[in-house]
């Protein structure tokens, strides 16, 4: 899939992803359920890959 984003949209997406990643890290640390924690870790890894792609496509959002 390909998406074209304006610089502003890319920056907004990166900001949202960073916030979500921070929230996920906190939730991973707080959960005692191993299966749920594994699912959260998988989601975090996926979102980290998306963020990396956004940052590579638009280096201005990497800050």
Which residue ranges define each predicted feature?
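N-terminal acidic leader/helix
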Residues: 1-23, 27
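Short, charge-rich amphipathic interface segments used for partner binding and complex assembly
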Residues: 30, 34-63
């Amino acid at each position: 899939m390909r998406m074209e984003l304006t610089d502003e949209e890319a920056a907004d997406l990166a900001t949202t992803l960073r916030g979500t990643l921070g929230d996920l890290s906190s939730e991973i640390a707080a959960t005692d359920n191993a299966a749920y924690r594994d699912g959260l870790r998988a989601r975090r890894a996926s979102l980290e890959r998306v963020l990396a792609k956004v940052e590579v496509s638009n280096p201005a959002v990497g800050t």
